[in-house]
Amino acid sequence: MVKAVAVLGSSDGVKGTIFFTQEGDGPTAVTGSVSGLKPGLHGFHVHALGDTTNGCMSTGPHYNPASKEHGAPEDENRHAGDLGNVTAGADGVANINVTDSQIPLTGPNSIIGRAVVVHADPDDLGKGGHELSKSTGNAGGRVACGIIGLQG
């Protein structure tokens, strides 16, 4: 079993810890929580670069090794890093429990060393008709991010 973790932070008080677990070549389980969010849906993605020198802006685009368009997690045509939305309750906390087969922790397309990002707005899953729908899901600003690192 391979485990990884990302500690999310921001200058706006949004913070959280996201855990990644993968058994063999199976799908990766993503669990954890993020606090300090406005209630509602927030885009949740793996971004290509594990670089936070300029905050979350330097994490690059969504992780997309197959050069596909943005989509929903269940879509065949999607970025590998498209994990859909997380929902923050009235308390501003989003509890995360996702399983995905396109974000391995080992091999040539591993997400280790990349970043996980929570966005300000809902991800329209590529179906919103906005000019950004097919690239970012029109999910708005990046409110928190963290680099995905191997865990003991």
Curated annotation (Swiss-Prot):
Instruction: Recall the GO molecular function terms of this protein's record.
Output: copper ion binding; superoxide dismutase activity
- Give the keywords, sorted: Antioxidant, Copper, Cytoplasm, Disulfide bond, Metal-binding, Oxidoreductase, Zinc
Q: Which domain of life is it from?
A: Eukaryota
Residues that bind Cu cation: H45, H47, H62, H119
Cofactor descriptive note: Binds 1 copper ion per subunit. Binds 1 zinc ion per subunit.
Function comment: Destroys radicals which are normally produced within the cells and which are toxic to biological systems.
Give the enzyme's EC designation.
1.15.1.1
Q: Where does Zn(2+) bind?
A: H62, H70, H79, D82
What this protein catalyses is: 2 superoxide + 2 H(+) = H2O2 + O2
Any Pfam family the entry gives: Sod_Cu
What is the designated name of this protein?
Answer: Superoxide dismutase [Cu-Zn] 4AP
Detail the disulphide connectivity of this chain as listed in its UniProt entry: C56-C145
Identify its protein family: Belongs to the Cu-Zn superoxide dismutase family.
Which leading EC class covers this enzyme?
Answer: oxidoreductase
Name any cofactors this protein relies on. Answer: Cu cation; Zn(2+)
Entry keyword annotation includes Cytoplasm: yes
Q: Which residues form the signal peptide?
A: none
Subcellular location(s): the record lists: Cytoplasm
What's in the GO CC field?
A: cytoplasm
**Main subcellular location:** cytoplasm
Subunit annotation: Homodimer.
Q: What is this protein's gene name?
A: SODCC.2
The record's listing under CDD domains reads: Cu-Zn_Superoxide_Dismutase
Q: Give GO BP annotations, semicolon-separated.
A: removal of superoxide radicals
